[in-house]
Amino acid sequence: ARTVEAAALAGVDSVEHGAYLDTDALRAMRENGTVWVPTLSTIGNLRGMGRFDEAAVAAILESAMENVAAFAAMGGLIAPGTDAGAWAVPHGSLSEYALLKQALGENAENVLSRGVAEIQRKF
């Protein structure tokens, strides 16, 4: 969390992944306009694979989804991104979008459109 916080404070445009962030890191990203691409599918796609302890995978995913919801509630910028090609993350998969919609609830479309617009503006 400290490295993400430091990167945001230094003005980084976006952060990819970030499963173990805390409130200070989220706040720094929000205050500096850093777009977060949480790549939840890299965690979510591990469920039921038998490769890792299911309880551990569930706990990591739950924490990451809670952070996504908290960041959105702060007004943070979130954009979808899959890290396609990672283990169990095939190209063309929509699992990232489904997990983000689950984490963000009714506001998913609004939150994601703001994040995507900022990514397009920056890059």
What are these regions (language model features)?
Residues 1-2, 20, 41-43, 83-87:
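Active-site beta-loop-alpha junctions enriched in small/polar residues
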Residues 10-11, 29-30, 51, 93-96:
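Short, glycine/charged-enriched secondary-structure capping and boundary segments
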Residues 13, 45, 120-121:
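Residue-level marker of structural boundaries
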Residues 35-58:
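Active-site loop ensemble at the mouth of alpha/beta enzyme cores that anchors a bound cofactor
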Residues 1-36, 58-78, 110:
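Histidine/acidic residue-rich metal-binding segments in metalloenzymes
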Residues 6-8, 26, 48-49, 90-91, ...:
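Short Asp/Glu-rich motifs
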Residues 52, 61-123:
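His/Asp/Glu-enriched, well-ordered alpha-helical/loop segment
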